[in-house]
Amino acid sequence: MRNLILVGPMGAGKSTIGRLLAKELRLPFKDSDKEIELRTGANIPWIFDKEGEPGFREREQAMIAELCEADGLVLATGGGAVMRGENRQALRAGGRVVYLHASIEQQVGRTARDRNRPLLRTADPARVLSELLAIRDPLYREIADVVIETDERPPRMVVLEILARLAELPPR
């Protein structure tokens, strides 16, 4: 396995699960959004404010391409990373892809107090999350080697299921 890549919506647990997986596998953990922030010296909301979503997506595409060239890491991606075909191609080629699925209710609960999510600066975040999931769910599934439900499950249980499901996959 080159890399273990986590995709899914905001609030699915990609960063939390990713850190635990990395610890379990003794691999480095990278979060593409955090790497963008480190490189730019600015947080995601600031990038959205100054460059708009297209500017952020350009940075994201470059970061994903770079991280997917690495070998032996656990990578958590931003929820919208799958929107670009180039990203989906890089993620698929970069290693095993795990789609962490979460219901709208879980996403709302997990993101409610997070001010670092520009797309949720709205009066109705549940509607936005629902619209985003309707568009992105087929794209997550398109590139996923496995789909894992995260609703109301302790992160440790999710990690154990991921490891078990990946062990069942034939090499590629």
From Swiss-Prot:
Swiss-Prot/TrEMBL GO biological process terms: amino acid biosynthetic process; aromatic amino acid family biosynthetic process; chorismate biosynthetic process
S-S bridge residues: none
Known pathway: Metabolic intermediate biosynthesis; chorismate biosynthesis; chorismate from D-erythrose 4-phosphate and phosphoenolpyruvate: step 5/7
InterPro entries: P-loop_NTPase, Shikimate/glucono_kinase, Shikimate_kinase/TSH1, Shikimate_kinase_CS
GO molecular function: ATP binding; magnesium ion binding; shikimate kinase activity
One Pfam family from the record: SKI
Keyword annotations from UniProtKB, A to Z: Amino-acid biosynthesis, Aromatic amino acid biosynthesis, ATP-binding, Cytoplasm, Kinase, Magnesium, Metal-binding, Nucleotide-binding, Transferase
UniProt main location, coarse: cytoplasm
Entry's EC annotation: 2.7.1.71
Quaternary structure (record): Monomer.
HAMAP family membership: Shikimate_kinase
Protein name: Shikimate kinase
Gene: aroK
